[in-house]
């Protein structure tokens, strides 16, 4: 009868283990798709689409050199490795929190040897003896007020926040690499245009000088074209410096020195363009893609869970335990 009462009590305690005392989560309702897609598609529907943006969005440029630079940057960035290490730490904390749901088992073992003095030993009796004892203790915390489940949920949200932080670093690295490559290509294109204009102005200057020599143009026309030519030529070193800065940034992002940067990285002289319409999705998808928003949401959920854990600590902890042992001597 006592054993049956114990079993019923244990089952009742387990049934009540869902009585968490933490605050309820209230998630904001997402806006309707019609309210969020309009601002993105009302201007020019042939430029953007409502399709979701792919994770490897830089491949939309269809540039193998850019793909290789992004892969190198992701592999060389130390901030990403640190973010991954923080994810591993959060994952280990989650495993530790989940282990609190399992019973705790302790094993004990002992052995003893004894020898009785001869004057205390009856005739014919053995003077030596050995003893062995084994035991096991089992304890289990009944999660009556949600302390254990709250810790698990908080650790799970911490892991999700760490994953979002790692995604944010990856997004930043990819964006910086793509921007540096685009700036280098754009600067190269501007240099080509500036040099072409200078060449045209040189031809115009030669023709104007000849006309001036035969009296068909005055000196003011020659001076004006010369000034335009010099002004345009003066912009070339500035643009070349911008291109060099972009290539230096690419070298830094990919973990190389400027001298080690492959020459092919700076050969493109055509600005980057996306041939197909740009998939942007809607406002809800845009917010869902932002890692900083996801990280903030997960940290808020983790803090909410910890409020419940703190409240559960104010209540008694219920632990079920049992032990068994055996001993033998000879």
Regions from the language model: what does each represent?
Residues 295-315:
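Long hydrophobic segments that form regular secondary structure
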């Amino acid at each position: 009868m006592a054993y049956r009462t114990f079993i019923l009590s244990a089952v009742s305690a387990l049934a009540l283990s869902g009585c968490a005392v933490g605050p309820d989560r209230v998630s904001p309702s997402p806006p309707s798709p019609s309210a969020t897609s309009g601002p993105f598609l009302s201007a020019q529907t042939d430029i953007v689409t409502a399709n979701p943006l792919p994770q490897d969005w830089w491949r939309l440029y269809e540039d193998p050199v850019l793909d290789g630079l992004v892969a190198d940057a992701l592999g060389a960035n130390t901030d990403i490795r640190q973010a991954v290490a923080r994810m591993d730490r959060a994952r280990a904390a989650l495993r530790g929190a989940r282990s609190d749901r399992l019973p705790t088992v302790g094993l004990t073992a002992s052995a003893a040897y004894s020898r009785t003095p001869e004057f205390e030993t009856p005739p014919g009796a053995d003077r030596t003896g050995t003893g062995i004892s084994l035991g096991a203790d089992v304890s289990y915390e009944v999660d009556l007020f949600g302390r254990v489940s709250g810790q698990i949920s908080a650790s799970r949200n911490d892991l999700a926040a760490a994953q979002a932080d790692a995604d944010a670093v990856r997004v930043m690295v990819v964006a910086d690499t793509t921007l540096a490559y685009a700036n280098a290509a754009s600067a190269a294109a501007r240099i080509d245009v500036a040099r072409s204009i200078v060449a045209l102005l040189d031809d115009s200057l030669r023709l104007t000088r000849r006309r001036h020599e035969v009296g068909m143009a005055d000196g003011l026309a020659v001076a004006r074209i010369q000034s335009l030519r010099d002004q345009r030529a003066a912009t070339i070193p500035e643009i070349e410096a911008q291109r060099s800065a972009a290539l230096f940034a690419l070298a830094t992002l990919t973990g190389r020195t400027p001298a080690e940067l492959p020459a092919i990285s700076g050969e493109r002289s055509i600005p980057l363009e996306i041939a197909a319409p740009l998939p942007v999705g809607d406002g809800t998808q845009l917010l869902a893609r932002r890692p900083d928003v996801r990280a903030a949401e997960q940290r808020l959920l983790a803090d909410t869970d910890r409020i419940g854990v703190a409240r559960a600590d104010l209540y008694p902890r219920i632990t079920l335990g049992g032990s068994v042992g055996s001993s033998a001597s000879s």
